[in-house]
Every structure is written in structure tokens, then in C-alpha cells.
Amino acid sequence: MAAKDVRFSADARDKMLRGVDILADAVKVTLGPKGRNVVIEKSFGAPRITKDGVTVAKEIELADKFENMGAQMVREVASKTNDIAGDGTTTATVLAQAIVREGAKFVAAGINPMDLKRGIDLATQAAVKDITARAKKVASSEEVAQVGTISANGDKEIGEMIAHAMQKVGNEGVITVEEAKTAETELDVVEGMQFDRGYLSPYFVTNAEKMVAELEDPYILIHEKKLSSLQPMLPVLEAVVQTGKPLLIIAEDIEGEALATLVVNKLRGGLKVAAVKAPGFGDRRKAMLEDIAILTKGQTISEDLGIKLENVALPMLGRAKRVRIEKENTTIIDGLGEKADIEARVGQIKAQIEETTSDYDREKLQERLAKLAGGVAVIRVGGATEVEVKEKKDRVDDALNATRAAVEEGIVPGGGTALLRAKKAVAELKSDVPDVQAGIKIVLKALEAPIRQIAQNAGVEGSIVVGKITDNTGSETYGFNAQTEEYVDMIQSGIVDPAKVVRTALQDAASVAGLLVTTEAMVADAPKKDSPAPAMPGGGMGGMDF
């Protein structure tokens, strides 16, 4: 086992604090509408330019192991906030630094760290309760756009695009962000349920120019197994022909005689039909077929359920207003499923999302949820150069996460105002234990840190801004617009933050900072002393005169 280097009390805390400061100082320059960019060197390709706090934090690794431990703890704050709320990472870092700095001063002055932490926790709970109580539900698409705009650093186009996407696919819908091949940023919305399987034969195409098959008001046969012989299918095919409606067959595979007969029927005009393979694999395929069945008010024809293909009647088939089948994708638009059944299925998938521990499974479940709940929107981010596209994509990701959080828990006045107003609730806390009271005092001061940093990044003195907002007791939403350097009603001006983001940033910062303040010893691998290289043997041949 390698030898260890151990540091204690003040020595350990000083080193740790230096690491916290290095990371936090690099991250906090990005805060607010006038925050600066950070350029990150990449081992290959162009450097990356970003204003995303967590991206900066993840890149920082310090040479000194003890300083690095402090930096990594604060990096954990940014990562955790990013995982839960998807935004607010810089705010969380600024808060953590403020709590650790103040805490270290008190500990150096001889205050009990454990009581100090208790005070920090009490004050944090009071502030979180206050922020949650102030939250205002997001009612209009305009408010969604405002949240997106603020989080995208004042880029109105991004805010409006996200609001439009949410309007189209609903709050449960999937919105993905991709890099575009062009300079324009655009929104592409797929309504209905889409899965990545196309037609089994190009002969099913109804529009030869676009190479797509479009079926209006079709019946949908959902079959779990392979279809290779025609005989079992005849009764259901004849029943559909009688109605004069088209038929879509979704099965594990369709081959041989069955496929040939369907193609011949289609070409002769006897039956408008198209066939596609079922999406997914294994158990996931079963679940997705069941989703399609619920969406279209049909039944999955499965021998597990004791239903044989020859016994299938028309009521067992699904229905939809329209189905569009391309070479790679199939989209079912306006399935005729019962709303109550679809909602029950959505609830079931949500419960599975809560339970799963695998990120991959969670992602797949969310995709299924979105397809059932409304649709999929893709924001394609464009720019003149690759560096610009990556920087913009970071901002779109942040804005998207912020708007989701806003819809979930509501909005509060932005620009650090909500944290500053929460001081009132924290100031009411009183403890008989002086050391606990000191912890409350630390949080009181830390709650000012984000607004001070936003002001500083805008080139304004933070203390003046804090004083002016605190003195205005008439309006709870009165704050500082760093973009225009004016004092305004934050909600009316559309400067809002999601309550979830503000709450999570404070909770995560206080949690990690509390642990750092109570640190008394640090252990790291001792640096290895390299042994000197052996001397080179003398050159030439001994005993020979040249």
C-alpha cells in the first residue's frame, strides 16, 4: 500500500479552501446575463468556449492533491444540481464557496463545527421553505419562453423555440437537442407516435415521388410473432377488405408467402396494405407493442394471451386517423385509444421511471412516455463554426432543463432576488446555542452571494445592489436587471428562475459546504520520490589506446 500524506485542522482546511476558491472563481465568472465565457483546452480539436458552470467545473483538476479534494467536492455540488434541476450549477457553486469561506473563518475562531453545521442546515431549510412558498405556477407559453430566454443568457430565439416545442408535444413530451448541419437553428416536431421501423417492401409505397406510404383511417393489426404463412391471416384480411379501409400490419417479421401475397394484393388494388417490423427487442418490444395497442384501442395478438391469428375479429384491431410510413420510420397520428387507458399507461411508465436505477432504461422509458403523451420535438442548433454550435447547444440544454423545472415547481423572481428575499425567513430563526446561531449567520450572508456576483459581472458594485433591493420593502419581486442595469419588477420584466433550480442549488451547496466545514483531517497519497537514474557505463573499450 502506498504511503499516505495526512494533514490536520487549519492546515487541511486552508488547502481545501484554496481548491474551492480556484474552482469557484473559474465558474462564477459565467454567472448572469453579463457573465463572461471560459475557454477550455481540448486534447484534440479546437478549444471549447462555454458559459455553462458544470462544464467548466468538470474540466478542473488541480496538481496539489489536497487542493484538488476541495475543488472536487464543489464540483460535486455543480454535478448534483445539474442532475436534479439541469441548471443553476453556477449559482450552486457561488453559494457553496460563500458558505465554506464564512464557515472556515468561524471554525478558525474556535466555534464548534458540528453546531455550525446544524445552524447551516436549519437556515437552509427555512430558506427552501420560503422559496417554495413564493413559487408561482407557470400558466402561459409566454412565461415558459421567459424562463428559457433567461437560462439561455438572454437569447430570445431559444426561449421562444422551447416554449413552442413544449406547446406542441406537451410537458411530458420528449424534446431533444442536436447539432444542425446548417447555420440556422430550427425546430422539428413529430406529432403522434413514431418508431424507427420502415416499410418491409418498397411496393407498399403510396406516394412514389416521396417514397412514403400513407394510410388514411386504417385498421392496425399488432402481432407479436413472425408471420410467414398466409392461411392464418385470411379471415382478418377478408374482414378488412369488406370495410374498404386500409390495413397496417405490425409484426416481429413478415416473410415468404405472407409478404408476397400482401404485395400482390396491394399492387392489384384489392387491399390497401402496408407491413412494418415491430420496434425494439425482447421485453421492450412487448411493452412497445402494448403501448401501440393502447394508443390505437387495439389488442396485441399474442399466443401468451391465448389469442390465435385465425380467430382475430375487427374489434381487436387498432384504429388511427392516419399512418405515415417512410423507409426508416413509422408514425401513427391520432390513435383512437381511450384517454383514460392512455393516462393509466402513462402513470404506469412514470412509476417505472421512478423505480429504475439504470440511466439507459430511464431514457428508454421516457421515450415511451413521450410517444404516448404527445410526441417528439427536435431542436437542431446551428452556427457558423463548430465552436459556436457547441457553445449554443450548452445554452439550449440549460434552457430546456430550466423550463422543465419551471413547469414542475413554478417560478420565482430571477437574478438572485428570491435568495435575497429568503433572508427574511432565515433572520427569524433564533437559537439559544451561540454556535448554531453562527451557522444561521453564515447562510444569511451566503444568500447575498449570487446577486453580488451577478452585479460584479455586470460591472456594478454588489453591496449597493443588495442594499437597494433590501431597502425596498414595498414589492417582493423588486430586483436588479443586470442586462439593462435597472431596478425593476422582476416578474413583470420576465426575469424569472425556476423555483426547483434555486431550491436545489441552495440545498446541494449547503449539503457539501456543511461537510467541508466539519473536515478536521485529510488523507492523500504521498508523492512518490523518483530514485535517480543509474549512471551510464563509460564509453570506449577499456585498456585500448586510441
From Swiss-Prot:
Region feature Disordered, mapped onto this chain: 527-546
Keyword Isomerase: yes
Record keywords, A-Z: ATP-binding, Chaperone, Cytoplasm, Isomerase, Nucleotide-binding
Family annotation (PROSITE patterns): CHAPERONINS_CPN60 (PS00296)
Transmembrane parts of this sequence: none
Protein's GO biological process: protein refolding
UniProt-annotated location(s): Cytoplasm
Enzyme class at the top of the EC tree: isomerase
InterPro entries (UniProt xref): Chaperonin_Cpn60_CS, Cpn60/GroEL, Cpn60/GroEL/TCP-1, GroEL-like_apical_dom_sf, GROEL-like_equatorial_sf, TCP-1-like_intermed_sf
Domain of life: Bacteria
Positions with a binding annotation for ATP: 30-33, 51, 87-91, 415, 497
Record GO terms (molecular function): ATP binding; ATP-dependent protein folding chaperone; isomerase activity; unfolded protein binding
Biased composition (Gly residues): 537-546
PANTHER family recorded: 60 KDA HEAT SHOCK PROTEIN, MITOCHONDRIAL
Biological role: Together with its co-chaperonin GroES, plays an essential role in assisting protein folding. The GroEL-GroES system forms a nano-cage that allows encapsulation of the non-native substrate proteins and provides a physical environment optimized to promote and accelerate protein folding.
Family in the record: Belongs to the chaperonin (HSP60) family.
Stored HAMAP family: CH60
Summary of subunit composition and partner proteins: Forms a cylinder of 14 subunits composed of two heptameric rings stacked back-to-back. Interacts with the co-chaperonin GroES.
Protein name: Chaperonin GroEL
Organism the protein comes from: Methylorubrum populi (strain ATCC BAA-705 / NCIMB 13946 / BJ001) (Methylobacterium populi)
